[in-house]
UniProtKB/Swiss-Prot annotation:
The lineage of its organism: Bacteria, Pseudomonadati, Thermomicrobiota, Thermomicrobia, Thermomicrobiales. Keywords: ATP-binding, Cell membrane, Hydrolase, Membrane, Metal-binding, Metalloprotease, Nucleotide-binding, Plasmid, Protease, Transmembrane, Transmembrane helix, Zinc. It comes from Thermomicrobium roseum (strain ATCC 27502 / DSM 5159 / P-2). ATP binds at G291, P292, P293, G294, T295, G296, K297, T298. NCBIfam families: FtsH_fam (TIGR01241). Residues 95-198 are extracellular. The chain crosses the membrane at residues 74-94, 199-219. Binds 1 zinc ion per subunit. The keyword Translocase does not apply. PANTHER family: ATP-DEPENDENT ZINC METALLOPROTEASE YME1L1, METALLOPROTEASE M41 FTSH. PROSITE patterns: AAA. It comes from the Bacteria. Zn(2+) binds at H512, H516, D588. This is ATP-dependent zinc metalloprotease FtsH 2. Its EC number is 3.4.24.-.
């Protein structure tokens, strides 16, 4: 048996007992050869000498493993080098020679150039002619301009090219005439067969695909050997900021002082945990940033990363879920394991609603993968050990769709509202965004903040950038007030359109906008007028802009009734002046109807129904929360609500008509001024309309 050449399976083990490889030995008595055993034992020693990170990368990176299998083989590397050299040589030998840019020219221009003796060589292939001029000639739009020939006025100089190589197509069945014509003018003629691919061209077309197929075959063969870890999707894709953290601090965030204070306390807890632990305080496990889009939730998280001296893991919630079942839960586990290993640390999850939606409890089938990811997130957040010093910060602009289990204390202990900034906050944000921009002394940031109610931090940053773009386009060295005004008009009203309107239509639009303005001017408590314009912008033919002097957080019934009258002022002016109404009031009617429905159904401001909430006019934000809304409201109550809405609109229309009849002269003057100047500011509005009534107290 000692000399037998039978094969036997042998399982080689490392020195630590872990099986390495199953090999075939030629001798039954001896087992595995000593040389093979030494080689495998050496490879196991190399594996143990690698760092944990290198071992993890080698085991979880299948593509890197495959490439090592290719380039680690002498024969595989040799074939790759031979293929590359062969492809390069074939391309270098058979590639067409180029002596300059080639241009398509007309056949008539080609004939004229031959007759002038300006064509040196020609290659004829079927109906296609490739040739070369004796000298560079000017070509524009397929026409060749001979030396000394002037360019027509209709030719754009930017389209003129100087070329030495050209291509043209000859008429059918004229090869014999063209050949004789070229020989007559002593042009060197070459003929190539048309149709069918030459051997060099075929090789150049096929070799890259053969090489690619071979490479993919080698990759697939190496991947199949380690199919257990072929897809390393289970690891979290969170980005870690430790040493190279974002250069954003709380000083770069303005307008959200309360949110900054909440997050600053979390940062201080992570930097100095001992002083909190001494008195038994527990670090909040989660902080949820809630607010509209563009208010700075992600910017606050970046500021936390810049302020905190601890590892900061940043990930988008959409990165958890993939097409494979269980990947999301695996990534959540991996993320929290990495964070716990480097505690104290912070995990930031952006757009939490991507995985934190309320779990499905209705008809049909829910999203099992997303729900598994959410369940794993709930377990990880609630399964922290005491004093692990790991904080989860999440951001969302859709808190109403989040699962209640995610919002309970013990998971997200704090909900920080990041709302729209007030006037003072907007001014501070503008000062931050204009730090690196040269602005003129006439720019009033306080006034600009007052003129932008409802703007978020992202809107204000865009406003400053748009103003800088306007100034750069005008060739200015600084950004002045006019640049900011144009940028603000562009954001609020849209881009100016070069729309040609007739005089009658301009007059109609002028009276429509003047009607809005006159009703707003003579309605006590209405917002001041900032601008009236009949210049078409966006989808509107004209616009009347009102801006409150101070931010408002509550509106009285009288203020809303005045707003209804202002919205219907344009339609009332059309009816009064032209005894006809147009389609220009469509958006006004839509806004007025929605406002009246909210007054009746949400705020209880109707005399017919009194203080009652019906849910009318409520904006149902997100589908999937409830398929059908259950209104336990009688039909008679809904009919009365519709009648109340109609009454509010009719009374507002009558009020607008009454104001316009009383101030018909001012209406005509303002409309004439708009026709003449197109855009009118607040100073000229006061000159035309006279003294404005003082706002009276509410009823």
């Amino acid at each position: 048996m000692r000399g037998s050449w039978l094969f036997r399976s042998c399982l080689v083990r490392r020195s630590d007992g872990y099986p390495i490889e199953r090999v075939q030995s030629k001798r039954i008595g001896r087992g595995c050869s000593k040389r093979l055993a030494r080689r495998i034992e050496g490879s196991s020693m190399d594996e143990r000498n690698r760092t944990p990170r290198e071992q993890r990368e080698r085991s979880t990176n299948p593509f890197g493993k495959a490439l090592r299998g290719i380039f680690g083989s002498r024969f595989g590397l040799l074939w790759i080098i031979v293929g590359l050299i062969l492809f390069y040589n074939l391309y270098a030998v058979f590639r067409p020679e180029r002596s300059g840019p080639q241009s398509e020219i007309a056949y008539s221009s080609f004939v004229a150039a031959v007759e002038k003796g300006l064509v040196s060589t020609v290659t004829l292939s079927g109906q296609t002619i490739d040739g070369q001029f004796t000298q560079p000639l000017r070509v524009a739009n397929g026409i060749v301009y001979l030396p000394g020939e002037p360019l027509p006025d209709t030719v754009d100089p930017a389209q003129v090219r100087s070329v030495t190589r050209f291509r043209t197509v000859i008429p059918e069945n004229t090869q014999a005439e063209v050949t004789a014509f070229l020989q007559q003018h002593n042009v060197l003629l070459k003929v190539q067969p048309s149709g069918g691919a030459s051997l060099p061209g075929l090789l150049l077309s096929v070799l890259p695909f053969v090489f690619l197929i071979g490479l993919l075959f080698l990759l697939g063969r190496n991947l199949s050997r380690g199919q257990q870890n072929v897809f390393s999707f289970g690891r979290s894709r969170a980005r870690v900021y430790d040493v190279e953290r974002p250069q954003v601090t709380f000083a770069d965030v303005a307008g959200e002082e309360e949110a900054k204070a909440e997050l600053a306390q979390v940062v201080d807890f992570l930097k100095n945990p001992a002083k909190y632990h001494r008195i038994g305080a527990r670090l909040p496990r989660g902080v949820l940033l809630v607010g509209p889009p563009g208010t700075g939730k992600t910017l606050l998280a970046r500021a936390v990363a810049g302020e905190a001296g601890v590892p900061f893991f940043s990930v988008s919630a959409s990165e958890f879920v993939e097409m494979f079942v269980g990947v999301g839960a695996s990534r959540v586990r991996d993320l929290f394991e990495r964070a716990k290993a480097q505690a104290p640390s912070i995990i930031f999850i952006d757009e939490l609603d991507a995985v934190g939606r309320q779990r499905f409890a209705g008809l049909g089938v829910g999203n099992d993968e997303r729900e598994q990811t959410l369940n794993q997130l709930l377990v990880e957040m609630d399964g922290f050990e005491a004093h692990t010093d790991v904080v989860v910060i999440a951001a969302t602009n859709r808190p109403d769709v989040l699962d209640p289990a995610l919002l309970r204390p013990g998971r997200f202990d704090r909900q920080v509202v990041v709302g729209l900034p007030d006037k003072r906050g907007r001014a501070a944000i503008l000062r931050i965004h204009t730090r690196g921009i040269p602005i003129a002394p006439d720019v009033d940031l306080e006034g600009l903040a007052a003129a932008t109610p409802g703007f978020s931090g992202a809107d204000l940053a865009n406003l400053v950038n748009e103003a800088a773009l306007v100034a750069a386009r005008r060739g200015k060295q600084v950004v002045d007030r006019s640049d900011f005004e144009e940028a603000l008009d562009k954001m609020l009203l849209g881009t100016t359109r070069s729309l040609l309107m007739s005089q009658e239509e301009r007059r109609l639009v002028a009276y429509h906008e003047a009607g809005h303005a006159v009703v707003a001017y003579f309605t006590p408590g209405a917002d001041p007028l900032r601008k009236i314009s009949i210049v078409p912008r966006g989808r509107a033919l004209g616009v009347t802009v009102q801006a409150p002097e101070e931010d408002r957080f509550n509106y009285t019934r009288n203020q809303l009734l005045g707003r209804l009258a202002v919205l219907l002022g344009g339609r009332a002016a059309e009816q009064l002046v032209f005894h006809e109404v147009t389609t220009g009031a469509q958006n006004d009617l839509k806004e007025a109807t929605q406002l009246a429905r909210r007054m009746v159904g949400l705020w209880g401001m109707s005399e017919e129904l009194g203080p009652i909430y019906l849910g009318l006019g409520e904006q149902h934000v997100f589908l999937g929360r409830e398929i059908v809304q259950d209104h336990s409201i009688g039909t008679s109550t809904l009919d009365r609500a519709d009648q109340a809405v109609q009454r509010l609109l009719n009374e507002a229309m009558e009020r607008a008509e009454r104001i316009l009849r009383e101030h018909r002269e001012e209406l005509d003057r303002l409309a004439d001024l708009l026709i003449a100047e197109e855009t009118v500011g607040p100073e000229k509005i006061r000159e035309v309309l006279g003294e404005q009534p003082v706002a009276a107290g509410d009823d």
